[in-house]
């Protein structure tokens, strides 16, 4: 049994600095085909991938994201929940399918499909020697992204992904993840608070030491402090409204 894929994914880290070398059409096609091979719920394939190499479109999306690597990369993908094609099928169907694809379950199916496709692309890109970074920041202004990309009803932008050759001075490294025993529950969920707090305290120490070493003492916050800052920020509270404007999560 080979550990090749295991070792590959264990080295994963986000790359935020890329060389100015566009991906070839052949590479883009292979990445998309790898993504399409992902599992999909009930064969709905409720996603689409928008590939972007137009610099003006990239710049418009950078304004939404606020991140320079939305422009400075080898290629940009945007992953969307896509029920537009299902809506077209619905126009000639004898039953009302919108009750399904416009439901909360439909939203979950589309989001999971898009995520599985994207992870296939990420692993394939890293196997080819490229780096990637996911871009949830495109949800900072969903309405603007829908306008930039001409998204019809029943299509919703979930996240993007920048891909490219890592820059020579790119020095990212895999961050320590939550402990195995904290995320893996055998047979049923173990919610004992004392155990949970103890595991998180150990992890907070690990993350603080990681940042301390990576930044020569300039950064020492814990994982819990990061979570408090991020979730306490109350960002993107318009998601339900934007989803419903797209024709999704109507029930």
UniProtKB/Swiss-Prot annotation:
CDD domains: NfsA-like. It comes from the Bacteria. Belongs to the flavin oxidoreductase frp family. Reduces FMN, organic nitro compounds and disulfide DTNB. Involved in maintenance of the cellular redox state and the disulfide stress response. It holds the Pfam family Nitroreductase. This is NADPH-dependent oxidoreductase. Its cofactor is FMN. Signal peptide: none annotated. Keywords: Flavoprotein, FMN, NADP, Oxidoreductase. One of its GO terms (molecular function) is oxidoreductase activity.
């Amino acid at each position: 049994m080979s550990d090749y894929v295991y070792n590959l994914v264990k080295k994963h880290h986000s790359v935020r600095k890329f060389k100015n070398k566009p991906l070839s059409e052949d590479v883009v096609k292979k990445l998309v085909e790898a993504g399409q091979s992902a599992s999909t719920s009930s064969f709905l394939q409720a996603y689409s991938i928008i590939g972007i190499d137009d610099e003006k479109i990239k710049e418009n999306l950078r304004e939404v994201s606020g991140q320079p690597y939305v422009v400075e990369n080898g290629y940009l993908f945007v992953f969307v929940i896509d029920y537009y094609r299902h809506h077209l099928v619905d126009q000639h169907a004898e039953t009302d399918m919108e009750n399904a694809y416009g439901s909360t379950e439909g939203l979950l199916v589309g989001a999971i499909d898009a995520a599985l496709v994207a992870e296939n692309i990420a692993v394939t890109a890293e196997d080819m020697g490229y780096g990637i970074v996911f871009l949830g920041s495109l949800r900072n202004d969903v309405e603007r992204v829908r306008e930039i990309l001409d998204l019809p009803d029943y299509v919703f932008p979930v996240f993007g992904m920048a891909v490219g050759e890592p820059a020579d001075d790119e020095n990212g490294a895999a961050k320590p993840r939550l402990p195995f025993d904290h995320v893996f529950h055998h047979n049923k969920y173990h919610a004992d608070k004392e155990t949970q707090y103890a595991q998180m305290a150990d992890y907070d120490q690990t993350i603080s030491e990681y940042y301390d070493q990576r930044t020569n003492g300039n950064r020492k916050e814990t994982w819990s402090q990061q979570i408090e800052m991020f979730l306490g920020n109350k960002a993107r509270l318009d998601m339900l409204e934007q989803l419903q404007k797209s024709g999704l999560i109507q029930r």
